[in-house]
Amino acid sequence: YGMTETTAGATIGYPGNNKIGTVGKAFVGDIRIDNPNEAGDGEIQFRGRHIMKGYYNNPEATAETMTEDGWLKSGDLGREDSEGYISVTGRIKEIYVSSAGKNIAPLVIEETMKSIPLVSQCMLIGDNRKYCSALFTLDVGAILRDKHGMDGAKVPKDPAEQLAKLKEFGHELSEYTDSPEIHAELQEHVDRLNGQFSNPEQLKKFTILPRDLSVDHGELTPTLKIRRIQIRENWASEIEAMY
């Protein structure tokens, strides 16, 4: 893990010095987690001979990126464990602040919730809110596999083909998005996964959307990253119903 300003890599994992879910340890210079929250998440910062001296002919940008004592601000959120392994958990610009003033990093929570087998997409809601909630979409491929016994290797990759295959089984996606049983199944997973987070970060409610997020609706970038502003606009009534 690293950036151009750190002369490429600044951390590395290698055989005998590796931990799944981390980007390894510093292999040159120093790394610190600046101003960590209760969960240990703070800005990842670097210092050492491998760090740039500044941006060419741009002292303003340099001053914004470098601290007075020579630490480079990465703009990334992360944490360091007791063995020195670094985990990247989000971006500073994506930090939510609850109505109680708690800083919440949505990315790590969203990725954790996406580990639920039936969940395709998850977007956390919590900025200036009393508690966290989420929008879920269902993974049609997982429905075909887990609810209809379809061989995972034969599940179509194309979302439209997945929906067509679901219809061949005599079902519509709405039967699952509106299903109390599916909601209860997801709730069991959410309750279990919530244990990984502090109380302000835990999901108190969630809503299953009637369709997956899409590029066509402006909700995903071409590289399939979620576009938070557009999603909040498209599903405003569903979000407000959770509060």
Residue ranges and their predicted role:
Residues 1-6, 49, 51, 55-56, 85-114, 134, 143-180, 199-201, ...:
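Adenylate-forming
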Residues 26, 34, 38-98:
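Conserved ATP-binding/catalytic segment of the ANL
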Residues 69, 116, 197:
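Acidic-histidine catalytic/liganding microenvironments
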Residues 1-19, 30-32, 120:
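Gly/Ser/Thr-rich phosphate-binding loop
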